[in-house]
Every structure is written in structure tokens, then in C-alpha cells.
Amino acid sequence: AARSMFRQAAIDTWALTQFVTNNLEVDEASSPTGEPICFSTDKVGFFGHSQGGISGAIALAFDEDISSWVLSGAGGGLSITVLERKDPVDFEELIRFFTELPETETLSELHPLITLIQTAVDITDPINYAPSWNPRRESPAPNILVTSGCYDEQTPHFSASAMAVAGPRSRELLSSLI
């Protein structure tokens, strides 16, 4: 489930976008007002929080119809989360317990055990989709807002920063500063 759940949610986001952008209309028989209800399909936006933000970050690499994205409480780089997250359990301590890793051995994003965990989930980690966040190469890039809480215990803000920096606009911004 961990390797496919977020990818399936990204596909569901794309399918929902297709439904919304292909003349979403409520006919007068189904309308509570008795008149047809039409929606503007020119500017469709996405808001995803937590797991919705993670699946949205994946969908953003493929969906060409959504012009504005808000990814709230989402992050990339599971290795960061494994080392930083303490709620509901201290994942670093859990790893140490199951692997009998001594307290004297430092765990970091580059430790072989953490790298193995990261490799296992790379296919569904949003940080790997962030460089492709502009699928409309010929059109203007979508507007993207990534938010995180400084004290978010589920999604450490370092993971949101890592995901945002992996995006294409961050690279353009950084190269213009150098």
C-alpha cells in the first residue's frame, strides 16, 4: 500500500480534474434552485492537506488542467520524516529498537539503513516528482503554494522545504541568485 496509495490518489486527482473540466453542469431537474448550475472550468484549483498534499504533489507533475495548487502539510524525503518525526512514535528510536542499532551510531539521511528505507519509498515520494511540476511546457507554469507548520509533528517543515526546493522554480530562482 505504501508504494501505491499516493500514486493512486494522484490518478484519482487527475480523473476528478477531467470530470470537472469537461463541462461540469447540474441540470435543472437536479438543481436545488430549479435552474441549471454551471461552473467555470477555465481556472480549476487544487487544495490538498497532509496526505492530500502529498498525492497532489505527485499529480502536479502530470496534470495540465489545474492552474493553481496549494500543498498544505505535505513534504518530501521520507528520510527526513523518519529522523525528525516523534508523533505518534519516535521513528528513529523504533528503527534503533528493531535493528539493535547502538545509540553511539549516528543516524542521518546518508546512513545505509535510512537510505534503504528511502529507496523503498522513492517511487511514491513527492520529492522525486517536484522537478516535473510544470507539465505544460508550452503554457505558463502553474501557481504553487507549499505551506508547513514550524512545529508540525507529523510532517516536519524540513521535508516541506526539501520538496519545495526540488521544484523547477526553485532551481531557476537559485540559479538567478548565483
Model segments located where?
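Hydrophobic alpha-helical scaffolding
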Residues: 3-6, 10, 49, 59, ...
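The feature captures the conserved acid-bearing segment of alpha/beta-hydrolase catalytic domains
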Residues: 74-178
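Generic recognition of flexible, low-complexity loop/linker segments
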Residues: 2-5, 32-35, 54-60, 126-136
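Primarily recognizes the serine-hydrolase "nucleophile elbow" in alpha/beta-hydrolase
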Residues: 22-84
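Extracytoplasmic/secreted proteins, especially bacterial periplasmic and envelope-associated proteins
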Residues: 8, 12-15, 54-55, 158-162
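Residue-level detector of short, conserved catalytic/binding motifs and their immediate flanks
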Residues: 11, 44, 49, 67, ...
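Cap/lid segment of the alpha/beta-hydrolase catalytic domain
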Residues: 1-23, 28-32
